[in-house]
Amino acid sequence: MKIGVLALQGAVREHLRHIELSGHEGVSVKRVEQLEEIDGLILPGGESTTLRRLMNLYGFKEALVNSDLPMFGTCAGLIVLAQDIVGEEGYLQKLDITVERNSFGRQVDSFEAELDIKGIANDIEAVFIRAPHIEKVNSDNVEILSTVDDKIVAVKEGNYLGVSFHPELTDDYRVTQYFIDHIVAEHKHAAV
């Protein structure tokens, strides 16, 4: 399958590497037209306000709001997918959750953890950098996949996967592989 990484900011190369390690083709997505050429899209981390500005500038918001393309958001990508952000309205509103930005602290408070992620594995390496967490799940359709210190850090809803951390900054590509082999593949199979 062909999986795109929104290449406006963030760890694009690292996500592409994880896609390739998963046995699939990775594509840097820089133009809206490319969305029609891919089976799924990864929204990388970075700074969510900047990411939203760039998505507006290049026309991605409208295209993605109106799309059922499977999407995987990491860190800032999770924030972009959320229905609500504490204190403001969400952006793409694909995951029926409320997120809180920087809830684990500032840059100096960054940390790594080994997570038990439902349906994937109990030893997933995760890097948290100014990470958000999922404050609230707003629907029974959202499946909680993992928590850290009683904070929700990974969820799935339909075609969408969101995590608070940066799986791409480790050598462990199983979260990306799960997105492709389960969420994207199921969507593609259902569309046939």
Curated annotation (Swiss-Prot):
In the presence of PdxS, forms a dodecamer of heterodimers. Only shows activity in the heterodimer. It comes from the Bacteria. Catalyzes the hydrolysis of glutamine to glutamate and ammonia as part of the biosynthesis of pyridoxal 5'-phosphate. The resulting ammonia molecule is channeled to the active site of PdxS. This is Pyridoxal 5'-phosphate synthase subunit PdxT. Signal peptide: none annotated. Pathway: Cofactor biosynthesis; pyridoxal 5'-phosphate biosynthesis. GO terms for molecular function: glutaminase activity; pyridoxal 5'-phosphate synthase (glutamine hydrolysing) activity. It catalyses: aldehydo-D-ribose 5-phosphate + D-glyceraldehyde 3-phosphate + L-glutamine = pyridoxal 5'-phosphate + L-glutamate + phosphate + 3 H2O + H(+); L-glutamine + H2O = L-glutamate + NH4(+). Keywords: Glutamine amidotransferase, Hydrolase, Lyase, Pyridoxal phosphate. It comes from Staphylococcus carnosus (strain TM300). One of its GO terms (cellular component) is cytosol. Pfam families: SNO (PF01174). The gene is pdxT. PROSITE patterns: PDXT_SNO_1 (PS01236), PDXT_SNO_2 (PS51130). The active site is at 75 (nucleophile), 166 (charge relay system), 168 (charge relay system). One of its GO terms (biological process) is pyridoxal phosphate biosynthetic process. Belongs to the glutaminase PdxT/SNO family. PANTHER family: PYRIDOXAL 5'-PHOSPHATE SYNTHASE SUBUNIT SNO, PYRIDOXAL 5'-PHOSPHATE SYNTHASE SUBUNIT SNO1-RELATED.
